Each structure stands twice: as structure tokens, then as C-alpha cells.
């Protein structure tokens, strides 16, 4: 088998949040967004702007804050009440540029720059650092007042994504492909007790938790890795291929490891079947995957399958059917086969549920366009392991655990 490069999220065009006169709301938006990414484990560098009200004769006291260290740089000039000059202190901005240079050197996951404004439009301020980050392929997020939009377009050569000033727009720009890294960041390490691979399912165990993932059909018939391959592995290392590997079996084992962290015995939620979330919808419902009892629960659904039967659609139909749908039920197998990001992107505007025992039960996925998570928590691991080794399907799981549904409220 050839050695493949690691799976990495696609590059992002520099994001520019466009706003009218006044930027206080946008400053707060960038501050909140970068803070949330940092809480999730992403490496974010650069500066955000914070404004603290009146200072002597100035309208505001402005600071640039290094998002990685919290160090603040004063960028206000007190020019007096009658001054018509810019109140931004170029020396303070130059001092703050060290935060950007460090983030570029460390290859941050995201570089945030409070704004592209008058200084940058004239090649000053943080312009050099912005260009360096873009040239290095580091994702860049900034804000641009409408008066400087033409200058920004010239600065980037038109290679930019113009964003509306709201959180949903920022998360759409950040992209669904980054959900894998997001899930991986949340995993706490633990010794892996056992990895079981059956004909249809994979199970990863720690001392206190169990995670599942469907075995990819592409791995059937291939020789399985020897058990010692995972001997002494930590859960985080075992989960890494979920975000980095193109090998179907490695990726699926990684997803099962993710679920060994997230689908722990303490998770609680509704016990409803994930397909029942779409009962009674007036608009079209698209289902990715031929779930058990699908015809009974959603008789009018448009069903997409890798191996379609009569009245079903092939895999390529996803981008044709999902736009404009009211609801979309997506099999959790899409996480391991790496089709989930494009399916979520095509489902914008629909109510989306990720359904199946391989669904990670974590709110981390809600920001990426998932509204409900219908997964499984194992309670009798030995009994379920026997089912998996016997080649059993998910229909036999319910006696050995509980189905749990979480909602984005």
C-alpha cells in the first residue's frame, strides 16, 4: 500500500468581517470567536481590540490584546478634543506586531488581526505581518470597514472571503473539515484496554469507557493488524488517525477511540430514535444511509446509499438533494469515511441529525451545522463484544446499552 500524506483541512481564504461605521460590535465578535476556538484547543495567535471608554479628552481608550498571552498594548493617542487626526498610535500598533510575528513563527491554526484600516491600507501598521501570514498559508481573520473594502481587495489580490458580522458566518468560514481536529482536541488521554474488530463494527475500550464505529466496507477481506499494534496505546494517540489518516480502517478505529471519550456512561439525553426527529416535516427529508426500519419511520424520505437499491439514490446525489431540504439524517459512518464535511456544507439551512452508534455525543459538533446527535452508550461491554465478534448489526445493540440523543438548544 502506498504511503499517503496526512489528511489536513483545506486552506482558507483570508476572512474579512465587513462592517459599517463603528467597529465595537465586530471587535467583540472577533474576541468571542477566537476565545471559543482557544477553549476548544486550537492554537490561535494575533491580536483583538478592546475598548474601555473615555480617557481624558479621547473618545475611547483602545488596546490590542495578544490572544495567546493576554498581554495588552495601548494604541490610543490623546490628541485632544478638537483633533481631527487618527487617534490610533502607530508606535503602539508596531509594538503589538510582535504577537503576530510569534504566531506566524509557531504556525498557529489561526491568526486574528483586529482590523485592516487606514494604517494597513497605506502599507503600515500590521500590513507586513498580514502579508507574511497569507504567504505562509496560515488562516487569517480580520475586520474591514466598508470604506477600506477596495483597499483590502487590492491588498489580497481578491483572494479573500468577505464575511457578514455574525458568529454563524465565522463558523461557516472556519469550515466543516476542522471538526475532526476539534473532536481530537477534546480527548483526554487514557490507557486503551482492548480494540475489537468485527465484520461490521469496531469497539475501543478503556477501563471506564467504550466507543464504537462502523467498520468500513473497504477494509473487508484485508488482513487485520495484529493486536499488539495497539498494545500500550493511549486513547489520544489511537484517536489521532480520525483526524489525519486516509486509511479506512485506521480512521474508523480512530473514530471509535473518539467515541470512547465522548460516549461515556455519564452522558444523558433523550432516548428517541434519531429518525423520529424528522417525523411530520412538511418539506423534503434526505437520509444518508439505509437505516433499519427507515421505510416505516420515514416512508417519503429521499434515501442516498453507497450501493443504492430500487428507489434510492447513489452517493453522488448528496450535493443535488441536500440543498433546499428541510431535514437531513446523516449516518455516523460519514465521519469515518470523510464525507461528513461536504454533506454538512450541502445541508446548510436544513435541520441536520448525525445518527448511529458511531456518533460522538458532544456539543462540539453543533457549531459545524449539526442540530441533533443520536448516538449510543455501551453498558454491557462483554455482551456487546460478543455481538460484534459474531458479525452482528446495530439492531442487536439495544440490549447492551442505551441510545442517547442530544440537541443544540
Question: Model features per residue range: what roles?
Answer:
Residues 2-54, 67-68, 171-292, 388, ...:
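Electropositive, gly/pro-rich neighborhoods at or near active sites that engage anionic ligands
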Residues 16, 110-112, 141, 286, ...:
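Structural motif
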Residues 65-106:
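Helix-adjacent hinge/juxtasegments
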Residues 121-131, 340, 344:
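Short Gly/Thr/Asp-enriched flexible loops that form oxyanion-binding sites at enzyme active sites
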Residues 131-136, 298, 321-323, 344-349:
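Short, conserved loop/helix-junction motifs that constitute active-site signature segments
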Residues 154-173, 353-409:
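C-terminal functional extensions of proteins
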Residues 293, 298-321, 326:
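Histidine/lysine/aspartate-rich catalytic loop segments that bind and position anionic ligands
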Amino acid at each position: 500500500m502506498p504511503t499517503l500524506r496526512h489528511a489536513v483541512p483545506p486552506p482558507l481564504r483570508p476572512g474579512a468581517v465587513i462592517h459599517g461605521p463603528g467597529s465595537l460590535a465586530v471587535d467583540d465578535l472577533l474576541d468571542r470567536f477566537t476565545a471559543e476556538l482557544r477553549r476548544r484547543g486550537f492554537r490561535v495567535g494575533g491580536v483583538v481590540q478592546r475598548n474601555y471608554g473615555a480617557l481624558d479628552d479621547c473618545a475611547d481608550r483602545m488596546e490590542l490584546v495578544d490572544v495567546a498571552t493576554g498581554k495588552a498594548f495601548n494604541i490610543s493617542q490623546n490628541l485632544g478634543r478638537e483633533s481631527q487626526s487618527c487617534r490610533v498610535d502607530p508606535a503602539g500598533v508596531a509594538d503589538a506586531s510582535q504577537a503576530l510575528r510569534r504566531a506566524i513563527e509557531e504556525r498557529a491554526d489561526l491568526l486574528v488581526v483586529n482590523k485592516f484600516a487606514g494604517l494597513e491600507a497605506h502599507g503600515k501598521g500590521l500590513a507586513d505581518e498580514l502579508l507574511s501570514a497569507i504567504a505562509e498559508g496560515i488562516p487569517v481573520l480580520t475586520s474591514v470597514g466598508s470604506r477600506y473594502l477596495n483597499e483590502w481587495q487590492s491588498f489580497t489580490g481578491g483572494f479573500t472571503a468577505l464575511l457578514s458580522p455574525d458568529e454563524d458566518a465565522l463558523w461557516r468560514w472556519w469550515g466543516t473539515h476542522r471538526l475532526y481536529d476539534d473532536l481530537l482536541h477534546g480527548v483526554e488521554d487514557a490507557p486503551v484496554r482492548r480494540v475489537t474488530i468485527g465484520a461490521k463494527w469496531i469497539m475501543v475500550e478503556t477501563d471506564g469507557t467504550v466507543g464504537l464505529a462502523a467498520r468500513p466496507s473497504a477494509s473487508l477481506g484485508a488482513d487485520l493488524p495484529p493486536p499488539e499494534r495497539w498494545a500500550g496505546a493511549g486513547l489520544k494517540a489511537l484517536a489521532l488517525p480520525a483526524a489525519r489518516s486516509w486509511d479506512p480502517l485506521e480512521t474508523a478505529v480512530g473514530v471509535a477511540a473518539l467515541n470512547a471519550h465522548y460516549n461515556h456512561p455519564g452522558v444523558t439525553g433523550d432516548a428517541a430514535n434519531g429518525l423520529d426527529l424528522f417525523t411530520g416535516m412538511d418539506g423534503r427529508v434526505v437520509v444518508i444511509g439505509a437505516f433499519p426500519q427507515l421505510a416505516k419511520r420515514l416512508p417519503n424520505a429521499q434515501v442516498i446509499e453507497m450501493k443504492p437499491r430500487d428507489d434510492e439514490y447513489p452517493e453522488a446525489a448528496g450535493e443535488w438533494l441536500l440543498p433546499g431540504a428541510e431535514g437531513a439524517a446523516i449516518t455516523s459512518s460519514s465521519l469515518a469515511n470523510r464525507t461528513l464535511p461536504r454533506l454538512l456544507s450541502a445541508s446548510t439551512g436544513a435541520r441536520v441529525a448525525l445518527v448511529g452508534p458511531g456518533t460522538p455525543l458532544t456539543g462540539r459538533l453543533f457549531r459545524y451545522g449539526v442540530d441533533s446527535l443520536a448516538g449510543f452508550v455501551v453498558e454491557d461491554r462483554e455482551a456487546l463484544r460478543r455481538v460484534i465478534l459474531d458479525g452482528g448489526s446495530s439492531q442487536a445493540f439495544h440490549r447492551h446499552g442505551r441510545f442517547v440523543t442530544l440537541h443544540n438548544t
